[in-house]
Amino acid sequence: VQDFDRDGVDVQLRAGGSMRPSLDIQLKATVNLVEAGDGEWRYPLRRRNYDLLRETTVVPRILVILELPKEESSWINVTAEELVIRRCAYWVSLLGHPETKNTDSVTITIKKSNRFDVDAVKSLMEQARRGAIS
């Protein structure tokens, strides 16, 4: 059995231009995002993934979590005219987060304002060009 998840990166975005900024992304999808109040979500992330995302790397890394509807048949709709994925994706950078004594998972918080949309991708790529995601 091959281990395809060696470094916790599912997708890499690269831009053109002389600086060619890159961004590594770990993807998760869930029907169980917990509303934390104060404009935040809570999500239990496996300890291994937490550790991989909080370390310093040459290419900045973020976690993108797709909130899905409870009803599986509502997740996605594909026709010749459109691809519709229900709900919203959010991003978070765990760079510099503290070590944990937890052995299985770490509950992280994600700001609801951190929607993973076109504007966010543009901003994240500009931050990656400068070398850090905040």
Predicted regions: what they are:
Residues 1-7, 12-134:
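Mixed-charge (Asp/Glu-Lys/Arg
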